[in-house]
Amino acid sequence: MDSNLVNTEDTLVSVIKDVTTDFRGAMCIDSFSVEALLQAIEVYPGRPIINSISLEEYAPGVDKIDAVVAPTCKHDPVYIALATGPKGPAITAIEKADLAKQIYEKCHSKYGIRANQIIVDVNAFPIGSESDDDMNFAMESIKSIPLIKKVHPDLKVSMGVGNLTNGLA
């Protein structure tokens, strides 16, 4: 939840309090603001799912893993990890698996995050938006799944299938 119209930190906390009054399911907490995520996690009554972490730069010299995982890992959350690095989103299956490995290794070695706490989002791009005729974004995303499971069998994988057809209608 991010907006130029409201104070994200206050609004996200308010929404979580209101929604979780009668709701005990899992909730994915999403914000570009690390401060908003921290405040939201403090009031969330369950185990949060945090969207998202990656190896892309959050601030000069700080990637999103360090910015988000360091202050939130004490809450034992599940993290959605985007297959995105300093150069942007991974395109090929091998690039996606390589970034998943780097993300897992950094999260595990530096913060003690277990593989079953990470859901790798393979960043599915729309079919037909490839600039290279030999590239198939959908197949690259699908082919990345077993490669990511080879990194660690407990890593989970997600793919926004709605993204595959975005813009085709």
Model regions: which residues?
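Short, acidic/small-residue loops that bind anionic groups at enzyme active sites
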Residues: 23-30, 50-56, 146, 151-161
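Catalytic beta/alpha-barrel core
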Residues: 1-5, 25-33, 48-60, 115, ...
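Glycine-enriched alpha-helix->loop->beta-strand junction motifs that scaffold or abut catalytic
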Residues: 24, 42-49, 73-79
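Generic beta-strand/beta-sheet core signal
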Residues: 1-6, 30-32, 51-53, 80-82, ...
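Glycine-rich, proline-tolerant flexible connector loops at the mouths of alpha/beta enzymes
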Residues: 1-25, 124-134
